[in-house]
């Protein structure tokens, strides 16, 4: 089983408000992401919160997710992923994790399904989508790499693990540019969301 981990612990300093709660197409970013993951066949979803955790938790109380809180969120995204990996370590049914970022709301359920299928059918340890040569999110990491992710340098993040395992990485071409769209400023939000 692939468990999705949505990283939503940052301070959103450039955006000025919690990205998880930003409206998009009648939902919030986090609702849209969780819905797409569910439609893509992901049964178990963990959301890692940090800054403003209680405020966000109150707003997403009805979502079918497990909530973890990273009290060390200032260390960066990798620290939030590590909180989830430690939580999953004892769950032997977890074959890997699909990591997604809350500021990437344009996630395609068909791509989610395809990525899991390709992961299950292959011996690759990492599955990453690519649009016009540029990699995006979500990214699947095999359980075999949990140790490497837990030991990766904080300043390099999960990219250090991807770079160290290039031969074990499968890239999947994605038609949707949304996989690379990181909406982390008010300007990008107005351009890509409010201008839908």
Question: What are these model-predicted stretches?
Answer:
Residues 20, 66, 125, 168-170, ...:
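Conserved beta-strand segments of alpha/beta enzyme cores
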Residues 74-148:
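Conserved beta-loop-beta/alpha segment of the NTase-like Rossmann-fold superfamily
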Residues 23, 106, 139-140, 171, ...:
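Short aromatic/basic micro-patch
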Residues 24, 68-70, 129, 172, ...:
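Hydrophobic residues at beta-strand termini and immediately following loops
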Residues 1, 153-196:
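Conserved alpha/beta core of the MobA/IspD/sugar-nucleotide pyrophosphorylase nucleotidyltransferase superfamily
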Residues 1-57:
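N-terminal glycine-rich phosphate-binding loop and ensuing alpha1 helix
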């Amino acid at each position: 089983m692939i468990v999705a981990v949505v990283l939503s612990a940052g301070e959103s300093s450039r955006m000025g408000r919690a990205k998880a709660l930003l409206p998009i197409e009648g939902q919030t970013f986090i609702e849209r992401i969780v819905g797409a993951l569910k439609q893509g066949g992901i049964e178990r979803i963990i959301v890692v919160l940090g800054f403003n955790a209680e405020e966000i938790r109150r707003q997403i109380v009805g979502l079918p997710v497990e909530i973890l809180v990273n009290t060390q969120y200032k260390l960066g995204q990798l620290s939030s992923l590590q909180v989830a990996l430690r939580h999953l370590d004892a769950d032997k049914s977890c074959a890997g994790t699909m990591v997604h970022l809350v500021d990437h709301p344009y996630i395609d359920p068909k791509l989610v399904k395809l990525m899991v299928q390709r992961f299950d059918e292959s011996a690759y340890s990492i599955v990453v989508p690519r649009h016009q040569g540029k990699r995006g999110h979500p990214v699947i990491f095999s359980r075999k790499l949990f140790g490497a992710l837990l030991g990766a340098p904080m300043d390099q993040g999960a990219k250090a693990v991807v770079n160290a395992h290039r031969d074990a990485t499968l890239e999947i071409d994605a038609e949707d540019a949304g996989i690379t769209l990181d909406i982390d400023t008010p300007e990008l939000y107005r351009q890509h969301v409010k201008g839908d």
